Amino acid sequence: VWRVTLDRDGAPLLFDTIHPCGCYHQFVPTARLVARPPEPGVEEGALVVQALPALETGARVRLSIASGPHYLQRVDPVAPGAALPSDAEDYRFEHESALRALPLAGGGSASLYGPDGIVAGTERPERYALWISGIESPGAMRQWGRHATAFVGRRHFDDAFLVDRYFARAPK
């Protein structure tokens, strides 16, 4: 999952990503933000894997993703009008709501998600080690809005105050 948080003027402020289970929450702030110092205590802080320079108007970002596990490896700014590499892949976006009404062979439809928001059959072995975190089935793919992103403390991907919690405006 890749998210772009826009500033008041419509320019990118922060990029962040999670695996569809909620794990591996990584932050890539632009030059408009600086990371706040970690709060004292045992809570997981923000994992800032990279900071981007100021982006030109019209610039894009290129995501380098590992082919097997699909982990984010790097984010690079791409100048406006620059050609994409010849090996770049185009992906078609589908609205996530389509996964809640998948057509069945015999007619009707069914949701990809169970009543608990978890995708059946995506359980991973780490759930046995991380059950104590209180997160149901850690490592399993889950529905939007059900992504806990920390095993220590409380943090959710859709927290409205997430940016303010971990970042401050960079001095001008």
What are these regions (language model features)?
Residues 9-172:
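Domain-length functional cores that host ligand/cofactor binding and catalytic or interaction surfaces
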Residues 2-10:
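A short, surface-exposed beta-strand/turn
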